Amino acid sequence: MGSLCSRNKHYSQADDEENTQTAEIERRIEQETKADKHIQKLLLLGAGDSGKSTIFKQIKLLFQTGFDEAELKNYIPVIHANVYQTIKILHDGSKELAQNELEASKYLLSAENKEIGEKLSEIGGRLDYPRLTKDLVQDIEALWKDPAIQETLLRGNELQVPDCAHYFMENLERFSDIHYIPTKEDVLFARIRTTGVVEIQFSPVGENKKSGEVYRLFDVGGQRNERRKWIHLFEGVTAVIFCAAISEYDQTLFEDERKNRMMETKELFEWVLKQPCFEKTSFMLFLNKFDIFEQKVLKVPLNTCEWFKDYQSVSTGKQEIEHAYEFVKKKFEESYFQCTAPDRVDRVFKIYRTTALDQKLVKKTFKLVDETLRRRNLFEAGLL
């Protein structure tokens, strides 16, 4: 009898402990659910090479702890790969231009650089790249300085030459140092294609401050074959941040060289706007790469792009840059309102001029985004 009572007491204690654990788990789930309700979900979208991932890295630097030494070191093979890929594009481009252009001679490499070019092109085509050494840097510098490569660089918009080509070539010696650790700037310039989905949680004014919203930002692959992975992220989004590289109006897609990048961006922007799940979602349009745009637009006519064929130049210098920018901005505004029902006054739409590599500008822009979204939340709560 005593043993039965003892056993019942044991079972009772076990049940109590299990009930306590269950209650604790339920309490935690409830807390996490409540906490999640206060986290604003932001979706970072845009075509490939729009600068989305650079914006994402800036957020990590600005509003989180940045990159620790281990993370920085992980970028060494990425940066070395970028160097090899860049010099390969330029070398192969010069060969192609030398075969097909009327002024073929200016794209012909000097005799001493032909062999170097073939060697570097072979390295750039590998799946695994060697670490940069002083000898390889010497070869890359010799090829980079060849007049044929510099002429080819002027045709970079036709050849998928990355925007950061100059930066890589100016820092070769530092990249090849045996003790090299990438700087924050190196990481921002490093190019690695986003595949799948990456996320980060942050607050533009610090998570512990009552006045600040907490955001969860999702960056997704921009190439066409990556876009199907966006679908499951569409529900419950507070805002879409859409990046458009306005400097790429004369360039073609990496994955389809028949397609103009700006036309692809326009079509993607309009497709996203028409998605039913974004009916009430705020849109923040980042007209990105303005630093490149302001240099290019004075040399390459904006009406090179089919979408901008009605553009007419009115001035020179700064006035022309501003006129061209306002024209592009208006085109995106027209697209937005054409794709948005007239009664959708509850959907916020803002346009920001951005340069993803400019940390101060990115910080200022996200403060403005934060302010806009907080005002919208207060309005929806009836407090404004």
Swiss-Prot record:
Region annotation G3 motif: where it falls in the sequence: 215-224
Region of interest (G2 motif), residue spans: 186-194
Positions of the UniProt region annotated as G1 motif: 41-54
Gene3D superfamilies per UniProt: GI Alpha 1, domain 2-like, P-loop containing nucleotide triphosphate hydrolases
Source organism phylogeny: Eukaryota, Viridiplantae, Streptophyta, Embryophyta, Tracheophyta
Binding site for GTP: D49, S50, G51, K52, S53, T54, D163, L188, T194, G222, N288, K289, D291, A356
Chain spans, region G4 motif: 284-291
Protein name: Guanine nucleotide-binding protein alpha-1 subunit
Lipidation (S-palmitoyl cysteine): C5
Gene giving rise to this polypeptide: GPA1
One of the record's GO molecular function terms: G protein-coupled receptor binding
Superkingdom: Eukaryota
